[in-house]
Amino acid sequence: MAATLKSLKLVRYRAFCSPSAFGAVRSVSYWNVSSTQHGGQDPPEHISLCHSAKKVKNICSTFSSRRILTTSSAHPGLEFSKTSSSKASTLQLGSPRATGVDEEDVEVFDSFENMRVFLQLRPEYRVHSYNASETSQLLSVSEGELILHKVRVNQNNLQAQVIVDYLCKLSSLPAEQHPVLLGSTSFALLCQLSVKKIQLFDTQDLINVLKAFVILGIPHSHSMLDVYETKCCHQVWEMNMDQLLLVADLWRYLGRKVPRFLNIFSSYLNLHWKDLSLSQLVHLIYVIGENRQVSQDLMQKLESLILKYIDLINLEEVGTICLGFFKSSTNLSEFVMRKIGDLACANIQHLSSRSLVNIVKMFRFTHVDHINFMKQIGEIAPQRIPSLGVQGVMHLTLYCSALRFLNEGVMNAVAASLPPRVAHCRSKDVAKILWSFGTLNYKPPNAEEFYSSLISEIHRKMPEFNQYPEHLPTCLLGLAFLEYFPVELIDFALSPGFVRLAQERTKFDLLKELYTLDGTVGIECPDYRGNRLSTHLQQEGSELLWYLAEKDMNSKPEFLETVFLLETMLGGPQYVKHHMILPHTRSSDLEVQLDVNLKPLPFNREATPAENVAKLRLEHVGVSLTDDLMNKLLKGKARGHFQGKTESEPGQQPMELENKAAVPLGGFLCNVADKSGAMEMAGLCPAACMQTPRMKLAVQFTNRNQYCYGSRDLLGLHNMKRRQLARLGYRVVELSYWEWLPLLKRTRLEKLAFLHEKVFTSAL
């Protein structure tokens, strides 16, 4: 048996042209499902039907000469018996069809059929979709044996139409006999004859045979289906839209990816997309989503049709459209998403949980903040969550975090429902749920039970995390945002073995996540003695994040103006440093240092021009906010009071900057001497005479994406950054977007006064 299957993997199309090849064969399954799905492999781009037939002939002598199969009976055929059907029933069939489930268990359901509910809502769908519930008159066992006998006897004379008829009739055998049929060499012969005659099949023949294959559960990985895909490709331009959709649906039911057929189908659609009816449009979007294969140009055309039919689409179809666009990674415009949100809000109580989850997926993907829809979600989601499967709960939670939408009722319902059924979570579900709670910086009332159950599940799911390593850092960061640090898991995630695994096994670059975790542990877990990232990876992560942060901030005119105003107010660029105090937190800061007299220190060596390093005298550093100055500011008459003045002092020799004296994070070196209101920076003096800054300020230039939606509550990452800055002795000065951005439209003096108050009031 093993030798047979190995041989069948090497030969693309099997055929037993000589009856003697069957003489020693009885009831052996040639249809075992491969452990590797076809979807994970690239099928050949071009397959010649004539070439396939030649392969069939060449295989005949090979299998005739090899006595690789043995049995106790010399008579080939199909024995339909209770014993054989019982044994064969353990075989895994290839078709993802419905199975009986306990309706009370929300975690057990047929997701394949669940996504096809929309096909039952209009009679038009019956024309271009496959309905698994359709029944036909059953074929008796004796009639089936007779057909297989005719195949053996008349194999050289069977016509194409007869082959199609036989396949269709055999698919009407009782379901319990299907595995036995698949184990019959006579049925294998019939299938090979269909390959030889396939050039004579017309469109309807092709559809009927594919239906028979679906009913019988032909494994999706079987090489014979390559020939059928090629025939479908050749037949595309002979089919109408209904037939094309039906063929695509049948391939989906077989569970086989057919990229070549879909590419040609797309070409057909580019010419005929305007002719799509409503049912054809929705069904097409479903097919596209399930195959994850589409051109963006075609999807834009389909979006225009969605608008055309928007008032006729029902809620299940809305969910199907959202899921199709989501799975194909295609955006819907904000205008269409708002229309969809309006439709959902108008009948929110009648919206199925399935459609609700599909719609929130698309809102998450497009980041459209439909306020009324968000409010409605806050009202109905807590009632729906107990009846949702954990995957649905995960998508709902992730929607909330992606839109920064903190609704305590929703989050509490999620936290209450998960602990009893945490075993149903995949590693992905655990990761996304922990990330969502951490991102929203929210601890539910049952936080202890909630987090302990999820952390325990991470331990149980470790084999799964080895397969999908990207989910483990996501889990641990979500926990770290809320100050949970499971040491054993962190030690494993930062181990050289896991880091190497993460680099090799995932398409995602996890360096940023691992670097953020590593930096967080270094600050918040002083007693931690486990694994840390290598110095090389830390440096690489720091450089990457600084490049991204600097590029982002320097592209914002409002930020550049803020830097200039701070430099003007404090006395020059050497008093302000734009950098990442905590590189692992992914955002930059404007650092200011003050001495014991709350005067700014010129600590930024990088801002000092090389020609002026020898001697720098700065006068009038900083601005004292006196009553006289405030009067001038309010009257708008002050001019030039914020400009620092520099000049070289004669008789002084330049001093050399000594890099060896540098110290990390917060230990920036400077030489400060206060003489009659003037400050001198003459390079770096020995550490003994250095003046340590009394206060280090981290000026935060914030935006609305750092806060929960419609509130002033920081998100998890940014709250964690503030927490860590405080641990390192920094005082945060927040230039909040709701205060600072409107002020940018005011006069320069008003902006300077605001900055002065922020910086020096925070110091007090």
Curated annotation (Swiss-Prot):
Tissue: Expression detected in spleen, thymus, testis, ovary, colon, heart, smooth muscle, kidney, brain, lung, liver and white adipose tissue with highest expression in heart, smooth muscle, liver and thyroid.
GO biological process: mitochondrial RNA processing; mRNA processing; regulation of mitochondrial mRNA stability
Localization annotation: Mitochondrion matrix, Mitochondrion nucleoid
Domain RAP: 697-757
Keywords: Acetylation, Mitochondrion, Mitochondrion nucleoid, mRNA processing, Phosphoprotein, RNA-binding, rRNA-binding, Transit peptide
Location (main, coarse): mitochondrion
Modified residues (Phosphoserine): S95
Pfam families referenced in this protein's UniProt entry, alphabetically: FAST_1, FAST_2, RAP
Modification N6-acetyllysine, positions: K507
One GO CC annotation: ribonucleoprotein granule
GO molecular function terms noted in the UniProt entry: RNA binding; rRNA binding
Residue spans crossing the bilayer: none
Alphabetized InterPro entries for the sequence: FAST_2, FAST_kinase, FAST_Leu-rich, RAP
Organelle targeting peptide span: 1-27
Keyword set includes Thylakoid: no
Cited function: Plays an important role in the processing of non-canonical mitochondrial mRNA precursors.
Assembly, per entry: Found in a complex with GRSF1, DDX28, DHX30 and FASTKD2. Associates with the 12S mitochondrial rRNA (12S mt-rRNA).
Family in the record: Belongs to the FAST kinase family.
Protein's recorded name: FAST kinase domain-containing protein 5, mitochondrial
